[in-house]
UniProtKB/Swiss-Prot annotation:
PANTHER family in alphabetical order: ORF PROTEIN
Name this polypeptide is given: Protein CFAP20DC
Transmembrane segment boundaries: none
Organism of provenance: Mus musculus (Mouse)
InterPro entries: CFA20/CFAP20DC (IPR040441), CFA20_dom (IPR007714)
Polar residues bias spans: 266-302
Comp. bias regions, Basic and acidic residues: 444-461
Domain of life: Eukaryota
Pro residues bias locations: 327-339
Coiled coil start-end: none
Segments of this protein annotated with the region Disordered: 255-425, 444-522, 571-646
Length: 674
């Protein structure tokens, strides 16, 4: 627009609010209610008023993006009035001698100078408000100091956003005389045609990198250094900060920055955390392969290793003291989540085993056939896992060979998750190698039953639990059976054998006591039970008596499986495989399992309502699990089992005594008893 016009004079006027239609050449973005021309009595002339949001209400020159202004003079002056408490911003499109177009964003919103190879954000917090101001922008200085090696050629676009009053926009060939200016550089006065009236209070402010540095010092920050290093431009993300909580050298515009760049700091922290997790996993897997005497590792060593690695990367932070890590137990322990888990996207559905004390255990369930004594030992081993002492496990205890464990001691990558008592237990995991692991666990439990029983009685203070909910697989998809994510994963072939061969093992899980500290269910029992729930419990008891008398084991299930069908529905998995041998009991049943199965002879429901009733699902939403047997499925309230359908979801219902209904944590729905 101005490329072919003479620009050798003292100034070139770009915009003036005077005249019939001053915005004819401008593209106005905003309704007339927020952008209009009015006569200002203070300056005794017309002004353009822009109000509202600075992101939507603005004026742009030139109208078409294909056009360019071609303004070559060094200084751009905006004659504006910015009200108190309002944001203001302007955007300048400049072209350097290499014909590369770059943008300068000047805004009162920005608190620091930051730049990429093509964009720069410049703060305007030093601008004076509630007074008319000749804001003079040094285009040559910003171009050369922000974009390293660039030389200003022309100003090709201007965008002025709300909120402000705009009187004139023009360019100057020489630096204007600034208010309270003490520089010795040659200055010039603003041309008479562009000056405000002498009786109008106004100031002239020059904006360049030197002024920004001086303002930074005035506002209590550290001085900004001149552009000396190529690291600022080569990285494309250099910035100038107030250096709050950082060293002085972090606040360097173009100078050397010792720490990570601020804009990509979070990305670097995530990358460093990932590298630390991988290193910890690798070293722990090596520890598991060492001799027995060297396999007991304290958590302080692991914490020190993590702190050292983070300290080398410049991002060390305090670590919480956790329980010891016995490397000889092939079981990942609960840990305080600091960041979302790295395997967030996996489709594995984890089974949960709840104990009567409210703790969750993460265990390896074996599925080999053995005598009842061995199976009870397995239960003792499983239940004593979260009750580890704060000293290393004795090396003399026999242990199974530890497999490769990619999941041992995972340190999550992001903070902000709070622990929820309702979801305070780790998942129960099963592996393809569960046959072998079970036999090894049986042998181990025989020799170390007394040691583990003593450990069970000592509850450590620093037991950490998971705070994230277990996730289910998407509809229509089976779970991820690969062993890469967890030490044990469910195998479909093992599952069918579990269902058919191990009724004793199932009973062992329910009959054992998982903790010395009993869960006080009386604190969470509703004072009154509804009639529908009483009827349901009565029918449940009748069905239990009939099933106990029936020696034929109806529905094609073993006797222990029928017991499980009558006591609890699957509260864990929506997998297409059937997993009946390790179904967890309802949250408050624990050691009262036998008491519920054999109620007293008087048929008074209030005599045996001391425990929480099992989860009840409406018949229309009866949970169905696919079984490799022809007819193995669950039964609720004496109704016939629906036919097994593939990929049908199993509901996980939790009883809410306050609302007297059942809650599905996955869908957020509540179910009432009918």
């Amino acid at each position: 627009m101005f490329k072919n016009e003479y620009q050798g004079g003292a100034f070139v006027e770009i915009f003036s609010a005077q005249g019939k239609n001053p915005g004819a050449k401008w593209k106005i973005l905003g309704s007339p209610s927020v952008i209009w021309k009015e006569f200002d009595k203070e300056v005794k002339s017309f002004v353009f008023v822009l109000e509202g949001s600075s992101q939507t209400n603005r004026i742009q020159l030139p109208k078409e993006n294909k056009q360019i202004l071609g303004l070559i003079q060094r200084f751009l002056v905006l004659q504006i009035y910015i009200p108190l408490g309002q944001d203001f911003s302007t955007e300048l499109l400049i072209t350097d001698l290499g014909n590369i177009k770059r943008r300068l964003y000047l805004s009162t919103v920005h608190k620091e100078v930051s730049s990429t190879p093509l964009h720069a954000k410049i703060p305007l917090f030093m601008i004076q408000r509630k007074i008319w101001c000749n804001l003079c922008i040094d285009l040559v200085a910003f171009t050369s100091e922000i974009f390293k090696g660039a030389v200003f050629q022309s100003l090709d676009g201007i965008i002025v956003s709300a909120n402000c009053k705009l009187r004139k926009i023009f360019t100057l060939k020489s630096k204007p005389q600034e208010t309270a200016d003490k520089d010795d550089e040659p200055t010039d006065i603003i041309p008479r045609s562009c000056q405000l009236a002498t009786d109008v209070p106004h100031v002239t402010q020059l904006l360049n990198m030197t002024k920004l540095r001086q303002t930074e010092i005035k506002f209590g920050g550290h001085p900004l250094r001149s552009a000396e290093s190529e690291q600022f431009i080569s990285s494309g993300a250099g910035s100038v900060q107030n250096s709050k909580g950082q060293d002085v050298c972090h606040i360097a515009f173009g100078s050397r920055v010792l720490g990570p760049p601020p804009l990509s700091g979070r990305r670097n922290n995530l990358r460093q955390s990932t590298e630390t997790v991988r290193s910890i996993r690798y070293k722990n897997s090596q520890l598991c392969q060492q001799p027995t005497e060297e396999r007991s590792v304290n958590s302080t060593e692991v914490s020190a290793l993590l702190a050292d690695q983070q300290g080398e990367k410049g991002s060390a932070r305090p670590l919480k003291q956790t329980t010891p890590l016995p490397a000889k137990l092939p079981i990942p322990y609960p840990h305080p989540p600091q960041e979302p888990s790295a395997d967030k996207g996996s489709n594995r559905r984890r089974l949960r085993l709840k104990s009567s004390s409210g703790d969750r255990t993460e265990a390896h369930c074996g599925c080999s056939s053995g005598n009842n004594r061995s199976e009870e030992d397995v239960v003792m081993a499983l239940n004593s896992i979260p009750q580890l002492r704060t000293e290393p496990v004795r090396a003399s205890t026999p242990e199974p060979p530890a497999p490769e464990q990619p999941d041992e001691w995972i340190f999550p990558e992001s903070g902000g998750l709070t622990s929820d008592p309702a979801w305070s237990s780790p998942p129960l995991l099963l592996d393809e190698d569960s046959h072998t692991a079970s036999n090894l666990w049986l042998e181990t439990s025989k020799d170390s039953e007394h040691d583990q029983a003593e450990e069970t009685q000592r509850a450590p203070k620093d037991i950490f639990t998971f705070s994230s909910r277990p996730r289910s697989a998407p509809h229509g998809k089976s779970h991820d059976m690969s062993p890469k994510g967890c030490p044990f994963t469910l195998d479909t072939q093992d599952d069918s054998q579990v269902t058919k061969e191990d009724p004793k093992l199932e009973g062992g899980f329910y009959g054992s006591e998982s903790s010395e500290e009993e869960y006080n269910w009386r604190n969470y029992q509703p004072s009154q039970m509804s009639e529908s729930e009483l009827q349901m419990l009565a029918s449940l008891r009748r069905q239990q008596n009939e099933d106990l008398e029936d020696t034929g084991a109806p529905h094609g299930l073993s006797a222990s499986q029928v017991d499980h069908c009558n006591v609890s529905i699957s509260t864990s998995s929506d997998d297409t495989t059937t997993w009946n041998s390790c179904l967890p009991p309802p949250v408050n049943q624990g050691r009262h399992y036998q008491k519920e199965m054999n109620p007293p002879s008087p048929s008074n429901p209030r005599d045996w309502l001391n425990m929480l009733s099992p989860p009840i699902v409406p018949p229309s939403q009866q949970p169905v699990e696919q079984s490799l047997d022809s007819s193995a499925s669950l039964s609720v309230q004496g109704e016939e089992d629906p036919r097994v359908e593939e990929d049908e979801e199993v509901l996980t219902l939790l009883y809410d005594p306050c609302l007297n209904c059942y809650f599905d944590p996955q869908t957020g729905k509540y179910y009432e008893l009918v």
